[in-house]
């Protein structure tokens, strides 16, 4: 069975679009590890990856990924109307719709996700640093927040599951 045969068509498309934009599941798993390692000393990257995969299986997450990436690509291609074109190109701080889309992911596993998201959005470790680099000419206004939100949701899922096994 190929990698994509194990996923729904939507999930496979969302994963493929992230990969096209330079984001691997392992990148997001590293963010989960960054968020959770001090709370779970025996945590492994495999556990983090499992939780990322579970988050990616959610339809609302797939919808957010596909929508956000499409808007980022259209902004790169300069196919949006003003003032939206400029707001996305410069990642206008008062725009906020990118965060609203990310919150739809963060909220899946409860309020702990918001704390995780706020922290990782501020620190911008790993892949988030690259996605926020405006010098590349790429637009990741939505994708950086979506990746942060997926890591926050996966961290929340991990925390909830760990709590029930103690």
UniProtKB/Swiss-Prot annotation:
What InterPro entries does UniProt report for this protein, alphabetically?
Answer: PgpA-like_sf, Put_PGPase, YutG/PgpA
What is the protein named? Uncharacterized protein YutG
> Do you know which CDD domains this protein is assigned to?
PgpA (cd06971)
GO MF terms, alphabetically ordered: phosphatidylglycerophosphatase activity
Q: Which organism is it from?
A: Bacillus subtilis (strain 168)
Could you say which protein family the record assigns here? To B.subtilis YpjQ.
GO BP annotations of the record are: lipid metabolic process
